[in-house]
Amino acid sequence: MNILQINSSARSEGANSTRVANDVTTRLLAANPDATVTVRDLAKNPVPVLDEAALGALFAPVESRSTDQAARVAASDALIAEVQAADVLVLGVPMYNFTVTAQFKNWIDAIARAGVTFRYTANGPEGLLKGKTVYVALARGGQYRGSPLDTQVPYLKAVLGFLGITDVRFIYAEGLNMGPEAAAKGFAQAAADLDAALAA
């Protein structure tokens, strides 16, 4: 089993989403001791924004790409290869202003590429990253589970599903900024969610 852990907090140290993601990976390793783990920290190694230069590089013919364009595409190719090689993804996803972090969105923009991780067919789009399981470690300062303000879960289901990943399991750590008692309950709920996710 190949496990890919993506830490998407803007903080490389002390992030609650990373704490919960680490718990997921630790449990997966306990059940699969021969598994390999790759960890990508998007705070320490940020993915560039999908800007005009990036689009120019992606759409330029291979033989006419500049050195900078070739390097930009190669960096995106490496991120895609990590996902393609993974059997399981563990995503540490904090809530920033009711959505995912900019770091996470940049990663999604790098791995979602037509003809590589999805394709358009006569019957509509088809995801090409089938057969993977994703554990999403959600960390929130408040409590939003099941409410209209929880825009992360439908977004993640949509974008991962578009890429062919439909086995997506969510672990919620909420109320983490609402005082010590609420935070303790939030981490306890995350542990319970993880038990259920691993048993699914």
Swiss-Prot record:
It catalyses: 2 a quinone + NADH + H(+) = 2 a 1,4-benzosemiquinone + NAD(+); N,N-dimethyl-1,4-phenylenediamine + anthranilate + 2 NAD(+) = 2-(4-dimethylaminophenyl)diazenylbenzoate + 2 NADH + 2 H(+). The keyword Cytoplasm does not apply. Keywords: Flavoprotein, FMN, NAD, Oxidoreductase. Its EC number is 1.6.5.-, 1.7.1.17. Its cofactor is FMN. Pfam families: Flavodoxin_2 (PF02525). One of its GO terms (molecular function) is oxidoreductase activity, acting on NAD(P)H, quinone or similar compound as acceptor. FMN binds at residues 9, 95-98. Binds 1 FMN per subunit. SUPFAM superfamilies: Flavoproteins. It is an enzyme of class 1 (oxidoreductase). InterPro entries: Flavodoxin_fold, Flavoprotein-like_sf, FMN-dep_NADH:Q_OxRdtase_AzoR1, NADH:quinone_OxRdtase_FMN_depd. PANTHER family: FMN-DEPENDENT NADH-AZOREDUCTASE 1 (PTHR43741), FMN-DEPENDENT NADH:QUINONE OXIDOREDUCTASE (PTHR43741:SF2). Homodimer. Belongs to the azoreductase type 1 family. Quinone reductase that provides resistance to thiol-specific stress caused by electrophilic quinones. Also exhibits azoreductase activity. Catalyzes the reductive cleavage of the azo bond in aromatic azo compounds to the corresponding amines. This is FMN-dependent NADH:quinone oxidoreductase. The gene is azoR.
